[in-house]
Amino acid sequence: RNIKQHLDLIAGLPGEDYESFRRSFNDVHSIRPEEIQLGFLKLLKGSSMREEAEKYGMVYSPYPPYEIIKTDKVSYKEMIRLKKVEEMVDKYYNSQKFNNTLKFFYEKYETPFDFFYDLGNFFEARGYFNRNIGNTEYYKVFLDFNMEILKGDESYLKDIIKYDYLSFNKRRGMPDFIKSNIDKQLELQIKDELRERYSFKDYQIEKFDIDMSEYLNTGKIIKKECFYLVGNNCEIIKI
């Protein structure tokens, strides 16, 4: 599809509680729009919503943009939870740079909302909301989260993270935590076979321990040694 879908969800609307917002998020997510924008109701001066604030138990910031803090249906603590989900969705989902890795984690949760909530709690526990973290750290978070929270095997996950990383970042700066070693003799053999078709000034050979093509197409993880050419402009070609 050529038209990008951008869908908005507003927290704090009259009559909506935490659970109904969770359901709304999962319904919107199931459409797989390119961007999900989570916003929080703002009670602007002169608006009809501001005039009815007391009716719905709405408490809002006294400072512009007068954002909602709590309602009679959503407590302050629940609003903070939604803020954490918003941060994770904006960074990881809306960037479209982590799609394959996110798919890995969705399979481990009842809903995508629940995953983003847990990831937000992990960010908070690590203090990541209070400081700037580097580009590669955003990828490493997945490994740490998988190990500490889900107690999961990281061997397959590393390959999926690596594929996402190489799709948007140059191989030269690839972090050690997703690097894999390829047998030098085998590397020379592959280069000899492909030398007439590809310049190895522009491409490097990268080894994966799962069939990434199968995972991309079906979501199935099949253990199989595969090799890909990774171009200087983030082009990835299966060989």
Please report, for each region that a protein language model flagged, where it lies by residue.
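Radical SAM enzyme core and accessory elements
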Residues: 87-239
